[in-house]
């Protein structure tokens, strides 16, 4: 591992995070006032709906990093190049099926939301969804290159690229909004920048990393191993969608776009909160995979878990206390008094969410050791309970009901069950 790459990558992760959150804090209230509460709710509902297509990745993203890192550490170049070819084929097929599923969703939008949305609102929703579907289908085969870059432990380039996109995107989106293109223009610009970013990553892989893509031999034994590994990542992805996207769908169906907008503001703060923990945790999967390949001791891996966990604990508790003290007043000034319920909704999730956010490196360790199956099974059961609890609670308490169901689920899944598992398996 290049220590300089890792250290600079960590610094850039937090620079990127700071800039992203700062831009969002400045940009979100402007956007709310330019497109209105209802259209903001429509945009977030579309994001949640199409976001479900992201699970069509089937967990192969983590598999790219894990197995490419393994072949790099073993200096198996031919296997690495054929692995790249295999993933290109897999992701192209997934992109095609994503397009088909997306079109099915698009066709059924009127049936799902005609009772709680006006004709104009449905038109905006369908246009946004159509754009997002095509972007999702294209992003699958292009997305492999960002995973390859991480496998080579080149942390600086993707972080710098991310910082640039975070600066450019809101500027162009703002120009689009003030010229009257609304949420549709906002989505179009995000898609264009996303595709350009993926193309730049692809060029970096070929020109700088000198990777090759070969289709000479499809290794069915490694494919079987990858599918088994990825399946439980896929289950975890479904769980994440149930946790973080289903509430908007339920509220959109039961309460309409305005309630979705309020809940989305609360979700924005949850995203900020999560990002401070996950900013560097994604960098550890290739590192831990190579440590295991070289037969480093469990004690060394456990020390990484504890060290990073302590740092994350200090960061997360500092942020949480700050939000408890000033969050309510900030939301009313920042977004408007009509969003004041977002404070209590956010806290119902943020407080229990602190538990898993100080243990994010643990997931990388479980994946590297192929011990992530148990976590996926537990989370799936808890997520289903959360889903069925959210519906009646949403009818009683709107957004607060959904947040309460999510918070209780996190306490059971992460606070009780997974803590016990980490104690037994990662110590």
Where on the chain are the PLM-derived regions?
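Interhelical loop/hinge segments that connect adjacent transmembrane helices in multipass membrane
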Residues: 1-6, 123, 184, 201-244, ...
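Helix-loop junctions and terminal segments of transmembrane helices
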Residues: 58-74, 151, 209-210, 266, ...
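Hydrophobic alpha-helical transmembrane segments
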Residues: 16-19, 159-208, 229, 270, ...
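Transmembrane helical elements of multi-pass membrane transporters/channels
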Residues: 9-24, 189-201, 205, 220-290, ...
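Interfacial segments at transmembrane-helix termini and the short loops linking adjacent helices
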Residues: 107-131, 323-354, 400
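Interfacial/gating helices of multi-pass transporter permease domains
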Residues: 31-54, 183-188, 222-229, 251-271, ...
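Signature of the first transmembrane helix
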Residues: 5-70, 98-103, 135, 170, ...
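Membrane-interface junctions at transmembrane-helix termini in multi-pass inner-membrane proteins
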Residues: 3, 7, 136-164, 184, ...
């Amino acid at each position: 591992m290049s220590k300089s790459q890792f250290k600079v990558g960590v610094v850039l992760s937090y620079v990127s995070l700071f800039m992203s959150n700062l831009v969002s804090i400045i940009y979100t209230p402007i956007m709310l006032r330019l497109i209105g509460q209802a259209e903001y709710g429509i945009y977030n509902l579309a994001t949640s709906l199409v976001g479900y297509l992201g699970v069509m990745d089937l967990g192969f993203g983590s598999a790219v990093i894990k197995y490419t890192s393994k072949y790099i550490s073993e200096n198996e170049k031919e296997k690495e190049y054929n692995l790249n070819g295999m993933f290109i084929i897999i992701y192209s097929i997934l992109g095609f099926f994503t397009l088909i599923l997306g079109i099915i969703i698009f066709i059924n939008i009127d049936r799902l939301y005609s009772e709680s949305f006006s004709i104009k609102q449905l038109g905006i929703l369908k246009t946004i969804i159509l754009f997002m579907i095509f972007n999702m289908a294209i992003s699958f085969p292009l997305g492999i290159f960002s995973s390859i870059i991480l496998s080579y432990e080149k942390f600086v380039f993707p972080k710098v690229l991310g910082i640039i996109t975070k600066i450019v995107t809101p500027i162009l989106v703002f120009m689009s909004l003030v010229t009257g293109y609304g949420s549709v223009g906002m989505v179009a610009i995000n898609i264009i920048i996303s595709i350009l970013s993926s193309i730049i990553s692809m060029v970096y892989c070929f020109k700088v990393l000198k990777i090759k893509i070969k289709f000479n031999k499809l290794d069915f034994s490694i494919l079987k191993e990858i599918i088994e590994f990825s399946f439980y990542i896929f289950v975890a992805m479904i769980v994440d969608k149930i946790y973080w996207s289903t509430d908007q769908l339920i509220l959109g169906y039961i309460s309409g776009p305005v309630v979705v907008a309020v809940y989305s503001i609360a979700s924005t703060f949850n995203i900020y909160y999560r990002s401070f923990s996950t900013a560097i945790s994604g960098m550890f999967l290739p590192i831990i995979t190579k440590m295991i390949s070289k037969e480093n001791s469990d004690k060394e891996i456990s020390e990484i878990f504890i060290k990073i966990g302590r740092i994350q604990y200090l960061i997360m508790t500092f942020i949480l206390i700050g939000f408890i003290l000033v969050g309510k007043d900030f939301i009313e000034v920042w977004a408007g008094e009509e969003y004041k319920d977002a404070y209590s909704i956010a806290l119902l999730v943020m407080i229990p969410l602190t538990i898993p956010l100080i243990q994010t490196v643990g997931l990388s360790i479980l994946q590297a050791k192929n011990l992530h199956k148990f976590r996926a099974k537990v989370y799936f059961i808890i997520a289903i309970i959360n889903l069925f609890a959210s519906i009646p609670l949403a009818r009683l308490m709107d957004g607060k009901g959904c947040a309460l169901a999510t918070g209780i689920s996190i306490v059971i899944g992460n606070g009780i069950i997974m803590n016990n598992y980490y104690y037994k398996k990662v110590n």
